[in-house]
UniProtKB/Swiss-Prot annotation:
One of its GO terms (biological process) is purine nucleotide biosynthetic process. This is Bifunctional protein FolD. It catalyses: (6R)-5,10-methylene-5,6,7,8-tetrahydrofolate + NADP(+) = (6R)-5,10-methenyltetrahydrofolate + NADPH; (6R)-5,10-methenyltetrahydrofolate + H2O = (6R)-10-formyltetrahydrofolate + H(+). Disulfide bonds: none annotated. It comes from Burkholderia pseudomallei (strain K96243). GO terms for cellular component: cytosol. The keyword Amino-acid biosynthesis applies. Homodimer. Its EC number is 1.5.1.5, 3.5.4.9. Keywords: Amino-acid biosynthesis, Histidine biosynthesis, Hydrolase, Methionine biosynthesis, Multifunctional enzyme, NADP, One-carbon metabolism, Oxidoreductase, Purine biosynthesis. It comes from the Bacteria. NADP(+) binds at G165, R166, S167, S190. One of its GO terms (molecular function) is methenyltetrahydrofolate cyclohydrolase activity.
Amino acid sequence: MTATLIDGNALSKTLRAQAAERAAALAARGHRPGLAVILVGDNPASEVYVRNKIKACEDNGFFSLKDRYPATLSEPELLARIDELNRDPKIHGILVQLPLPAHIDSHKVIEAIAPEKDVDGFHVANAGALLTGKPLFRPCTPYGVMKMFEAYKIPLQGANAVVIGRSNIVGKPMALLLLEAGATVTICHSKTRELAAHTRAADIVVAAVGKRNVLTADMVKPGATVIDVGMNRNDEGKLCGDVDFAGVSQVAGHITPVPGGVGPMTITMLLVNTIEAAERAAAAA
């Protein structure tokens, strides 16, 4: 059996078209959605991510603002800029690209963003509200994964789901969203004993640890849905995920590729969150 491919590029295209329609409707009422992206330093991977985010905004009718600063930028200067953006009515979403230079406290920076403009969903107010099932914003990557389940009609209610990874950005919010959807969720991580015993019993496995081949074919229940959030490089320098795709795709029922799976969805859900922020602001105006 070969798994059905969950195509993140195709689904993203559909969702971005819907976002562009909503953006056009808002713009017609004088509320064009606006996203500000802040990049500090010259991390090459961060530069690529920021470029992709800005392009997605431009391609779909959003106003975008890119603030680029040298790695020597002080924390007070960055906080002052965030304060300005918080008060700017043209900006509905603020995103600070992580990681930040060592002398800047990323936690303090994220907390400085107004919760209603925290389109990454990282602010403590939004992270906490996720526990109650009523966040202003869901973190983009887990939100994108949930849209994949929806589009491919993957049943979540009553399903056994394993999330490998416990980061605040993916692992923990992913587990909460699956729980909210009615799945029975197990979170596994570097200290988990016998990872395979958990994954073999799972209907759904989400791998999000940033480690190659953390999930192999012998660890997967036949017909399971496997979501690969990992971003790594193989020995030839090619992009790969956390899952041994060649092997697991022969066992799983559905699987996401890397690249072309979860990655495009993350930026798409950033657009969706920004649209939602703009719609709220327009309703309150």
